[in-house]
UniProtKB/Swiss-Prot annotation:
This is Transmembrane protein 72. It is a multi-pass membrane protein. The lineage of its organism: Eukaryota, Metazoa, Chordata, Craniata, Vertebrata. Keywords: Membrane, Transmembrane, Transmembrane helix. It comes from the Eukaryota. Residues 147-163 have a biased composition (Polar residues). It comes from Homo sapiens (Human). Residues 141-163, 236-262 are annotated as: Disordered. It is found in: Membrane. One of its GO terms (cellular component) is membrane. Residues 238-250 have a biased composition (Acidic residues). The chain crosses the membrane at residues 16-36, 41-61, 86-105, 109-131.
């Protein structure tokens, strides 16, 4: 609490020093111009006083406008007011130090110019100290309400709650219509990778509980809703015939060793009737 009071007091001190320095610069510049001996220095002092007045006066103008008019949050006027209210303190420190250099070039000839130069240095150092203050932290974001995401390509809808660990995924038409995908799916079914008994009616709901290895992790439930494909028997048989290789058929009654054949000479004699 005491630190906050210190920073607030330092801020108002910097504003007061800035306005006072601008007034001194304009006053000394006007007097130097009226003397007519150092007109270039007089113009420089007047220019420096005007620049400091703009930098410091923007804060007071913003405060006055905030009292007279109510700006909507996020509007252009509100952003301009915030910029004027929190103009860079470190940038002011550098600018005031650079502007004070010319005030010490001829301190013997124009001794009274060292007064606004010293005030510029003091004001710059005060702003440098103010720049070390930490910025106010933004308020914590409010927990977002559950969002819903839709993927048009797969017609999948996912609903995720920020406070709930349950996730639900719904898939409509998970299998794409086409000869390639249908062929691959039916081929896997016919080969036995997916038994017919495991098939369920269309639009059934399967619940799978996923438990991570870490015992401290929360349980998640994933729900899948899938549409099954009905297989036409004729098309399945045609695909099975196209994929299956020709099989060799053997008979159990076929003898393993063929009977011996009669010699060719004896068979010819028998045919002529000699025996």
């Amino acid at each position: 609490m005491q630190l906050q009071v210190f920073w607030t007091g330092l801020e108002y001190t910097c504003r007061l020093l800035g306005i006072t320095t601008a007034a001194v610069l304009i006053g000394v510049g006007t007097e130097t111009f009226l003397q007519g001996q150092f007109k270039s220095l007089a113009f420089y002092l007047l220019f420096t006083g005007a620049a400091v007045s703009i930098c410091e006066g923007a804060y007071f103008v913003a405060q006055l406008l905030a009292i007279c008019f109510q700006c909507q949050p996020g509007s252009l006027a509100d952003r301009v007011r915030e910029k004027a209210h929190w103009l860079g303190c470190f940038q002011k420190f550098l600018a005031y130090l650079l502007l004070s250099v010319a005030c010490f070039l001829h301190p013997v000839l124009v001794w009274h110019v060292t007064i606004p130069g010293s005030m510029l240095i003091i004001t710059g150092l005060a702003y440098f100290l103010l720049s070390k203050r930490k910025k106010r932290k933004a308020a914590p974001e409010v927990l977002a309400s559950p969002e819903q995401y839709t993927d048009p390509s797969s017609s999948a809808v996912s609903t995720t709650g920020s406070g709930d660990t349950e996730q639900t995924y719904t898939f409509h038409g998970a299998l794409k219509e086409g000869p390639s995908s249908l062929f691959i799916h039916m081929k896997s079914i016919l080969k036995g990778t997916k038994k017919p008994s495991a098939l369920q009616p269309p639009n059934t709901l399967m619940e799978l509980s996923l438990e991570p290895a870490d015992s401290l992790a929360k349980k998640k439930q994933v729900h899948f809703e899938d549409n099954l494909v009905r297989i036409v028997p004729s098309l399945a048989e045609g695909l099975d015939d196209g994929d299956s290789e020709p099989e060799e058929t053997t008979s159990d009654t076929t003898p393993i060793i063929p009977p011996p054949q009669a010699p060719l000479f004896l068979s010819s004699l028998t045919a002529t009737g000699l025996f």
